[in-house]
Amino acid sequence: MPRHRSGPAPSAARHSVRVPATTRGRVLAGLGMAAAVVFFLTTVPFHRNWFDLHVYYGAVEHWTGGDPIYDYLRPGTHYGFTYPPFAALCMLPMTLVDWHSALAVSQLMNVAAAAVILHVCLDSVIRRESRHRWFAYTAAACMLALLEPVRDTVSFGQVNLLLLALVLADCRLLTAGRARFPSLGRLAGLGIGLAAAIKLTPAIFICYLLITRRWRAAGVAIGTASGATLLAAWAAPTASRTFWTEAMWNTDRVGSLAYVSNQSWQGMLARLTEPFAEPSRAVWAVGVVLLLWLWARRARQAVAAGDELAGFALTGAAACLVSPVTWVHHLVWLIPALAVLADKGLRADPGGRRRRRLLTWALVSYAVLCSSMVWLWRWNDGGAPGFLGANAYVWMALFLLLLLPLGEPGADRGGPYAQSGPYAQSGPSATMGLCAHATASPSPSVPVSWLSEQPASPTRPGSKPAPSGSAG
């Protein structure tokens, strides 16, 4: 099948960011960007010293030595293994190598996961916007590495990038997979199921498949998650019983809910009431119900508009908000939303207000998520301004859930990510982007309400401390 392009070939006359004209210049610029990022990452005073990877490594060694895995605590702390038993089975190979080898493999897996994330989020926009794909990917990789959730995931030795890559692989299969690789398209849901079996948070993406009527993919995801969980129950019955009946419900294992790193709705409530009282469970529950209602409504709109990446982005934002514990490194789930913002801005009418607003919002959101600003109020003592600043990432996730633009009026519907789901009869193809180095290809624009827009006439058929925290 021939490969389609979304819009005309990029034009040098429309580039909004100049790139070096020669190959040598681009190579030098790419090396310069990479060197600057490496220098920053090796000197910034927020490295987490592989804390969570130490927990994983120590826990599986403790387990293979004959002791209960959920009894393990890292020496000098009260933090232990908090993941389901299937995750422990996946980590067993670490016991075959020494610590430094395990660390090296962990970082290589993070690099591979980042490559998948960049490809799913950026491939179509880079094809549309840039003549120099490798240079655009280099710049995007440098930008990705500077995000605080990515920095924390890497320096904690966390698994969040791997989980996001698994989930986004299903996003790709739900769009391009079915059109270009039908046999692979039938595997959609496999990545979400594996991610949900490793960690509970990605299970919300199974709900996303259900509310958007992707029955086959939802069945694959549920079957995969259930099969992995049953495999763990067969291989480690005692650990499975302990996790599902005790460890999962013990919130003391993950740290203080009021700690500033907990950037969830529950964390915000806990900081609001600390130290005078516990946050109201009723208020938390009402907020969660409202957030889930809003998410379900907007996710259906995204799929009706053929905008699969936006649907996944909304689900990631909702996951960050409704989870009782959303440490800063969990906020990698907001990366697809940044991609959608940038791509929609680049597609908007050049010189128009909507373009400026969307690109400004994307840049401000990116800067905030790089800034580590919440740590300025880590002791929750800044009054009203401190409350606003300490919850900066909560506000960001909420704004993205409320206002993320959906669909693309006038976009080419035959591109590499064309939607083939239940709402594919109307709405433009999904477009993906996080950063680009040129203005968008011209496309018709329609009046919209500030930033967000409704899909076009869809036709539907029928506490975790900074240097040391829980391995959560």
Whereabouts are the PLM-identified features?
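Intrinsically disordered, low-complexity terminal tails and inter-domain linkers enriched
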Residues: 4-16, 130-132, 176-184, 348-353, ...
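Hydrophobic/aromatic-rich transmembrane helices and adjacent perimembrane loops
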Residues: 328-343, 394
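Aromatic-enriched
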Residues: 342-417, 430-438, 447-453, 469-472
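Primarily membrane-embedded glycan-assembly and transfer machineries that use lipid-linked glycans
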Residues: 2-186, 212-328, 344, 385, ...
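Transmembrane helices and adjacent periplasmic/lumenal helix-loop junctions
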Residues: 192-209, 323-330
